[in-house]
């Protein structure tokens, strides 16, 4: 017998289904017309799109697609951040996967790169992280990793979505099997050992005072332990897992708290992670923000000087500061830009053979050590650079480059259709062209839709701060007038 979901994607099964199938495939919530998978998996508000029934069926259909790609199915790793909804979604995903006949290894609270690493270095056929990264507590997300630890391809994501929307057929026999769930939180120790092994054997943080903003999130157990093991004096902020407060006025997108703590404790440096610890932002002893552009420059320069950076190539995004790009070119390096999103950086790194890439927002990928952005690893290696240089992080940054004034503004769009087709707004396209002509080669304009939130992001960069302010205000006004109403 064959069963199928109804053509309208409601999730209701046809009348030929058995009691077994109905117990496994319950009614889906409303699915938006727009694609479910964004630049970083599926994101949304918990309790709206991201419900237990949705995660159950997502797990089931993901399991079916994953099983179809291998003759010897292994387990699926599931990790999660500290959000209140993460337990629910992780358990529902596990139920769906096991109802598809797969074994699930539950890792519990851990950073996203931990899931990627353990998936790559085990018999797992996939990894799943329950997290909405830097988003507020009421949001959540589900991101998938291939068996090699890289982000799930768009084609596989589409196959899974086709199942959810009723475009795949299954026999009853295919849904009559079930797997088991194993709880494996101690595997996180294997990831910590990998972090340790990636560092120079001679590295010591003795004498360093380091502040860590853990954002009430996934790094609370890993980051402090790693820095303390290296001998650093560690001051922790937001240091427990707290699902009500994750990312709230803290972490990598709210650096004022870290800056104040560094001044208060007269620390050498500090690091702020986001909720799932796949990104990091640093702050030096003077309170200056050391973002992904600075980290790429400093780490890239170190690799270049050692002959470990093929073609002197770095991969950045369209957000990378012009000051960074021109300083890097001054060292004989080249910078290739991609769209915003670490999956695009990763793809370009594979295509070009680049060993280091990342985003201004703090997603840094180094292929010498792994295949995913890793906030804790990046922080450890930046501390290693400081140790090896014999000078402070503040001194390294001071001698690197001066940034061009860059202003980023966000405009929220609740209308999904307007957000999806924003590029068809002719007044906005005309305004962008006007700004580009107005600044010429002295600046840049970037308007884009966020891949993770219902936002239009407007960025203007210019040698002249007044010009940057003028054009960003002008463009935001156009977006608010023609799209946000």
From Swiss-Prot:
Cofactor note: Binds 1 Mg(2+) ion per subunit.
Entry keywords, A to Z: Isomerase, Magnesium, Metal-binding, Phosphoprotein
Chain positions found as Phosphoserine: 133
One Gene Ontology term from the biological process aspect of the record: carbohydrate metabolic process
Cofactor(s) for this UniProt protein: Mg(2+)
Catalytic activities: alpha-D-glucosamine 1-phosphate = D-glucosamine 6-phosphate
Presence of the UniProt keyword Isomerase in the record: yes
Chain positions recorded as Mg(2+) binding sites: 133, 274, 276, 278
Post-translational modifications: Activated by phosphorylation.
EC category: isomerase
MF terms (GO), sorted A to Z: magnesium ion binding; phosphoglucosamine mutase activity; phosphomannomutase activity
Signal peptide: none
GO CC, any one term: cytosol
Pfam families hit by this protein: PGM_PMM_I (PF02878), PGM_PMM_II (PF02879), PGM_PMM_III (PF02880), PGM_PMM_IV (PF00408)
InterPro entries documented for this protein: A-D-PHexomutase_a/b/a-I, A-D-PHexomutase_a/b/a-I/II/III, A-D-PHexomutase_a/b/a-II, A-D-PHexomutase_a/b/a-III, A-D-PHexomutase_C, A-D-PHexomutase_C_sf, A-D-PHexomutase_CS, Alpha-D-phosphohexomutase_SF
UniProt similarity note: Belongs to the phosphohexose mutase family.
PANTHER family named in the record: PHOSPHOGLUCOMUTASE (ALPHA-D-GLUCOSE-1,6-BISPHOSPHATE-DEPENDENT) (PTHR42946:SF1), PHOSPHOHEXOSE MUTASE (PTHR42946)
Functional summary from the UniProt entry: Catalyzes the conversion of glucosamine-6-phosphate to glucosamine-1-phosphate.
NCBIfam families, sorted: glmM (TIGR01455)
Record's protein name: Phosphoglucosamine mutase
Record organism: Crocosphaera subtropica (strain ATCC 51142 / BH68)
């Amino acid at each position: 017998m064959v069963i199928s979901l109804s053509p309208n994607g409601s999730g209701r099964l046809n009348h030929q289904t058995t009691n077994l199938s109905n117990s496994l495939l319950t009614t889906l919530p409303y699915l938006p017309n727009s694609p479910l998978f964004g630049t970083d998996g599926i994101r949304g508000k918990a309790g709206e799109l991201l419900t237990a029934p949705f995660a159950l069926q997502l797990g089931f259909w993901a399991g079916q697609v994953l099983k179809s790609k291998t003759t010897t199915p292994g387990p699926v790793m599931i990790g999660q951040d500290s959000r209140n909804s993460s337990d629910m979604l992780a358990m529902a995903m596990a139920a769906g996967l096991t109802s598809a006949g797969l074994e699930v290894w539950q890792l519990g609270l851990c950073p996203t790169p931990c899931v990627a690493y353990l998936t790559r270095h085990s018999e797992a056929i996939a990894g799943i992280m329950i997290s909405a990264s830097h988003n507020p507590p009421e949001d959540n997300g589900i991101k998938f990793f291939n068996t090699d630890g890289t982000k799930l391809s768009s084609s596989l994501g589409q196959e899974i979505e086709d199942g959810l929307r009723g475009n795949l057929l299954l026999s009853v026999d295919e849904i009559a099997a079930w797997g088991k769930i194993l709880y494996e939180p101690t595997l996180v120790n294997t990831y910590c050992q990998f972090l340790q092994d990636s560092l120079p054997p001679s590295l010591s943080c003795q004498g360093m005072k380091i502040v860590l903003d853990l954002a009430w999130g996934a790094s609370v157990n890993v980051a402090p332990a790693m820095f303390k093991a290296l001998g650093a004096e560690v001051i922790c902020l937001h240091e427990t897992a707290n699902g009500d407060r994750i990312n709230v006025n803290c972490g990598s997108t709210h650096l004022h708290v870290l800056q104040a703590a560094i001044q208060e404790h007269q620390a050498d440096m500090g690091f702020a992670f986001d909720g799932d610890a796949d990104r990091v932002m640093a702050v030096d002893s003077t309170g200056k923000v050391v973002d992904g552009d600075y980290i790429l420059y400093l780490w890239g320069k170190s690799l270049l000087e050692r002959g470990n950076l093929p073609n002197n190539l770095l991969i950045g995004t369209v957000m990378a500061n012009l000051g960074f790009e021109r300083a890097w070119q001054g060292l004989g390096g080249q910078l290739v830009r991609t769209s915003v999103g670490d999956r695009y950086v990763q793809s370009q790194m594979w295509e070009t053979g680049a060993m280091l890439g990342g985003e201004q927002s703090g997603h840094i990928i180094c292929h010498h050590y792994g295949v995913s952005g890793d906030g804790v690893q990046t922080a450890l290696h930046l501390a290693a650079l400081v140790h090896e240089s014999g000078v402070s992080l503040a001194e390294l940054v001071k001698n690197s480059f001066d940034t061009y004034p860059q202003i980023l503004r966000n405009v929220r769009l609740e209308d999904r259709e307007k957000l999806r087709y924003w590029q068809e707004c002719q007044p906005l396209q005309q305004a962008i062209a006007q700004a580009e002509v107005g600044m010429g080669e002295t600046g840049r304009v970037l308007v884009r839709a966020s891949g993770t939130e219902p936002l239009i992001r407007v960025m203007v960069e210019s040698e002249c701060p007044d010009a940057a302010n003028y054009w960003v205000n002008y463009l935001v006004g156009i977006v608010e007038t023609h799209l946000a109403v």
